Amino acid sequence: LFRLVGSEMCIRDRNIIEVKNVTLLRDQKVAEFPDAVTERGTKHLKKLIEALKQGYKPFVLFLTQIQGINNFKIAKDIDLNYYKNYLIAKKSGVKFLAYRCLLSNKEIKIEKKINIIDE
């Protein structure tokens, strides 16, 4: 369940939100997605572009629980096809957001928006 109060994703809009869990950390300052080739992830990006054409506001949320990082990027060396489709989706108007989360026994709480690095 996501509470979207005061966020970039207004509840009144027709939003579609794809959530990706980010676990890859190769550089101590940058979280990355994907950690393996993801044909399914690429398919989802294409569906979000189609949803945009049908009047929806599509978002992809990259969420990580890796503490101390302030940056995120697509691991294009792992899945170049996903990276290319990410760029197409972004240019088409799909919105991409990345957040660092705090994890506890009771909840996962969004802590901070982090930068998305496009290489």
Language-model-detected regions and their locations in the chain:
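A general structural detector for well-ordered alpha-helical segments in enzyme core domains, enriched
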Residues: H44-K47, N85
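Nucleic-acid nuclease catalytic cores
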Residues: K20, R26-E39, K46-I78, R100
